[in-house]
A protein has these predicted regions:
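Solvent-exposed beta-strand/loop surfaces of large extracellular or lumenal domains
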Residues: 25-50, 68-72
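C-terminal beta-rich recognition modules with glycine/proline-rich loops and embedded aromatic residues
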Residues: 1-6, 41, 61-183
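Beta-strand-rich binding/interaction modules
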Residues: 12-32
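Surface-exposed loops/turns
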Residues: 11, 42, 53-54
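Extracellular and analogous surface-interaction loops
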Residues: 5-13
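Short, well-structured beta-strand segments within conserved domains
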Residues: 3, 15-19, 53-62
Length: 183
């Protein structure tokens, strides 16, 4: 994501601009009028002290990685600062069914942008192991997620949504270690 700020003082002014660099991003870049600013640290403020004139442009570019947050036998998905939810309007399964995230690299989930459903701002698909225990291999499906702010906004009793998704119980799970290629 990127945020652009245009400075518009009435006259050239010496001042400090403090930008909060989000802690959830692994990488952030700040430029002033196209020149990169050094000393950018995630999770802290970056103070730019200079003479500002009308039209100066400050840009903050951040990576917005997908993340999985685990709590006991539940997981939640996030992308940058946005919490995602499973919404029954996608008709891709019961929102309370157990899943197991399928990971790609170092436990990072794959979130693929999908065509937004009417009434949603962001929509993604992600591969998950679907189903309950059996003697056969469980299927991997593409589960839909949307931004939490849009989840369930139909205001009817039929629509259900969920942020904390129940996990397929994995007795071999040890502190986030991937097992057989799955998280």
């Amino acid at each position: 994501g990127q945020v652009d700020i245009t400075v518009t003082p009435d006259k050239e002014t010496q001042a400090q601009l403090a930008l909060r660099i989000p802690g959830w991003t692994p990488k952030a870049t700040v430029t002033v009028n196209g020149e990169e600013v050094q000393g950018v640290t995630t999770g802290q403020y970056l103070v730019i002290d200079r003479k500002w004139k009308a039209g100066d442009k400050v840009s903050l570019a951040v990576d917005m990685p997908a993340r999985i947050v685990r709590l006991e036998q539940f997981v939640a998905y996030e992308r940058g600062p946005v919490v995602l939810a499973r919404d029954s309007r996608f008709n891709d399964g019961f929102v309370d069914e157990v899943i197991m995230p399928a990971s790609t690299q170092n436990g990072t989930p794959t979130l693929t942008p999908a065509t937004p459903m009417p009434g949603t701002w962001m929509t993604f698909t992600t591969p998950v192991i679907h189903g309950t225990y059996s003697d056969r291999q469980c299927d991997i499906i593409q589960m839909h997620l949307c931004d939490f702010a849009s989840a369930g906004n139909q205001w009817d009793e039929k629509t259900r949504y969920r942020v904390w998704l129940p996990l397929l119980y994995e007795p071999m799970y040890k502190g986030g270690t991937a097992i057989n290629g799955y998280w």
